[in-house]
Regions:
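C-terminal boundary/linker segments immediately following FHA domains
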Residues: 15, 54-56, 63, 71-107
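Short polybasic amphipathic segments
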Residues: 1, 66-70
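Membrane-targeting and insertion segments and their boundary/processing signals
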Residues: 21, 61-62, 68
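Buried hydrophobic-core signal for structured, non-transmembrane domains
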Residues: 47-49
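Intrinsically disordered, low-complexity acidic Ser/Thr-rich regulatory segments
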Residues: 1-40, 89, 100-107
Length: 107
């Protein structure tokens, strides 16, 4: 999101206004990435980005109150169903609401 430094992903990351590193049951503690939410429209633990093996990554909405959108690099926009993983591709943008956009870049 605007003003945030890039974060190198090596394991699970939880995105939210006050994320819980242990929200993913049965998985090791995750890195947390706090995002601004002045209107509290972004859930505390809103979404997770997780490795899926062989360099691929997945996005999961963690049952957030207002949902998560995935804006694909090809122009498609999709609602991410709660607790369902969807593939992330280079250039995709995770839309958490309140104009908080997280760009996924593969290097």
């Amino acid at each position: 999101y605007a003003g945030a430094a890039p974060v190198e992903l090596t394991h699970n990351v939880i995105l939210g206004r006050d994320p819980n590193a242990r929200v993913l049951t049965g998985r090791p503690a995750a890195t947390v990435m706090r995002v601004p939410s002045p209107a509290n429209e972004i859930s505390r633990s809103h979404a997770a980005v997780m490795p899926s093996g062989f360099g691929s990554w997945m996005l999961m909405d963690l049952g957030s109150a207002n949902g998560t959108l995935l804006r694909s690099s090809n122009g498609n926009v999709q609602d991410v169903p709660p607790r369902v993983t969807v593939a992330l591709n280079d250039g995709d943008v995770i839309d958490l609401g309140e104009n908080v956009l997280v760009e996924f870049i593969v290097r």
